């Protein structure tokens, strides 16, 4: 009887530890740089979006990094960033190809998603 009780308790503890130890992991946004400057070569303003993202399991698990910019009128601009280096995801766009205006205030949402559907998001703002 003692052996059966010990076995049952050990199975219960094992099940509880296995279930309680699983912690879903998600990407981790740890740096953001957004800038706008005039580029004489293109005769236009250039927007530079840079986001540094890590993943606790593997960097290759990061599927996408997106930036959403909202102006004071509620208009939204969206950019899908590309990986460029170990942690860096970035995009460089000409202002004429966007509805952005250098010097305006923008609320910014950044979302990093991995292949398992877990996300990290960061909210910030831009004002030149």
Positions of predicted regions on the chain:
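Extracellular acidic, Ser/Thr/Pro-rich low-complexity tracts
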Residues: 50-59, 114
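Aromatic sugar-binding surface patches on proteins
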Residues: 83-96
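Surface-exposed, short loops/turns at beta-strand junctions within beta-sandwich domains
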Residues: 96-105
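Proline/serine/threonine-rich low-complexity linkers at boundaries of modular beta-sandwich domains
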Residues: 21-31
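Structural beta-strand segments of beta-rich domains
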Residues: 45-49
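Sec-dependent bacterial lipoprotein signal peptides
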Residues: 1-21
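Short beta-strand elements
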Residues: 116-128
């Amino acid at each position: 009887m003692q052996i059966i009780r010990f076995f049952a308790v050990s199975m219960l503890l094992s099940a509880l530890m296995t279930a309680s130890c699983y912690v879903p992991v998600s990407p981790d946004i740890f740096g953001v740089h957004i800038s706008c400057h005039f580029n004489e070569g293109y005769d236009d303003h250039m927007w530079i979006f840079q986001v540094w993202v890590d993943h606790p399991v593997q960097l290759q698990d990061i599927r996408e990094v997106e930036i959403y910019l909202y102006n004071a009128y509620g208009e939204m601009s969206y950019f899908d960033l590309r990986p460029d280096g170990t942690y860096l995801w970035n995009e460089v766009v000409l202002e004429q190809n966007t509805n952005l205006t250098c010097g305006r205030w923008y609320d910014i949402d950044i979302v990093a998603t991995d292949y398992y559907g877990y996300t990290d998001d960061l909210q910030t703002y831009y004002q030149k």
